[in-house]
């Protein structure tokens, strides 16, 4: 039986309205009763995740910023990785040929150059929001990650530009069809989970994980049991064809799967 369960948030644990369902919350509590370590592995900021954890009364480790930070149950930083300052400076100051909006993250919060109210819908549960500032004024040595939000085809073209300019100095991934992230080289949820599991005296084979987007690829592919959401990006399913696909986040599929796993661990699972 797995000893650690790692969960992506958006499109996985959260429902489409960006809330946690009652069944999901109850199932997470059941896992803790079985002494299974909980880990939330997300692109969201730790400041937001602490608020969400506080409303749940659950102990969980946090992998935030898509692996740029790991925090203990007590809130201490176990691991940190920032963008190379030269990379951050280039991304923030270059005139990219794109209509996508740029968003910069550091330990102090989420920063962007203009009001984009539609982006706040994903954060209604926590109330977390961006700060509007001149992005070019942000110190490059304090940047954890940068992301671009916009049309998927536009982001694909932007990814080509970023790859040509940055070469092998950063890790690029889609955390959603409309969000392209620029992360420190070698930084992802999978590498962060490897650091955390080692800290806890576990192996990745002792872990299970759930996800729906390409920023979950390394994590899902490295654990003992990786589960892909039925609403996942097609690219993720194609990249990991050997992994099981469960139901939709709107049906609290993670809870459905885990309830079966806890109650009938030796029986085959069907998402229906």
Swiss-Prot record:
GO terms for molecular function: 4-amino-5-hydroxymethyl-2-methylpyrimidine diphosphatase activity; magnesium ion binding; phosphatase activity. It catalyses: 4-amino-2-methyl-5-(diphosphooxymethyl)pyrimidine + H2O = 4-amino-2-methyl-5-(phosphooxymethyl)pyrimidine + phosphate + H(+). Belongs to the HAD-like hydrolase superfamily. Cof family. Mg(2+) binds at residues 8, 10, 212. Catalyzes the hydrolysis of 4-amino-2-methyl-5-hydroxymethylpyrimidine pyrophosphate (HMP-PP) to 4-amino-2-methyl-5-hydroxymethylpyrimidine phosphate (HMP-P). Its cofactor is Mg(2+). This is HMP-PP phosphatase. Its EC number is 3.6.1.-. The active site is at 8 (nucleophile). It comes from Salmonella newport (strain SL254). It is an enzyme of class 3 (hydrolase). Keywords: Hydrolase, Magnesium, Metal-binding. It comes from the Bacteria.
């Amino acid at each position: 039986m797995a000893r650690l369960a790692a969960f992506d948030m958006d499109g996985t644990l959260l429902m489409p309205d960006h809330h946690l369902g009652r069944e999901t919350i109850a199932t997470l509590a059941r896992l803790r009763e079985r002494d299974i370590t909980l880990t939330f592995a997300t692109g969201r900021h730790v400041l937001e995740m602490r608020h969400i954890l506080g409303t749940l009364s659950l102990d969980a480790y946090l992998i935030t910023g898509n692996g740029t930070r790991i925090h203990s149950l007590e809130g201490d930083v176990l691991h940190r990785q920032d963008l190379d300052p030269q990379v951050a400076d280039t991304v923030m100051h270059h005139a990219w040929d794109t209509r996508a909006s740029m968003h910069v993250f550091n330990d102090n919060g989420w920063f962007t150059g203009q009001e984009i109210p539609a982006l706040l819908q994903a954060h209604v549960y926590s109330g977390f929001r961006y700060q509007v500032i001149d992005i070019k004024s942000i110190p490059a040595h304090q940047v954890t990650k940068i992301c671009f939000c916009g049309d998927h085809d536009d982001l694909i073209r932007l990814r080509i530009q970023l790859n040509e300019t940055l070469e092998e100095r950063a890790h690029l991934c889609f955390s959603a069809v409309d969000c392209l992230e620029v992360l420190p080289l070698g930084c992802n949820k999978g590498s962060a989970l490897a650091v955390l599991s080692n800290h806890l005296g576990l192996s990745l084979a002792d872990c299970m994980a759930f996800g729906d987007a390409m920023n979950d690829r390394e994590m899902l592919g490295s654990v003992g049991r990786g589960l892909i959401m039925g609403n996942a990006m097609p690219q993720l399913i194609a990249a990991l064809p050997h992994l099981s696909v469960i139901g939709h986040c709107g049906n609290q599929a993670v809870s459905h799967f885990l309830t079966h796993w806890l109650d009938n661990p030796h029986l085959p699972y069907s998402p229906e």
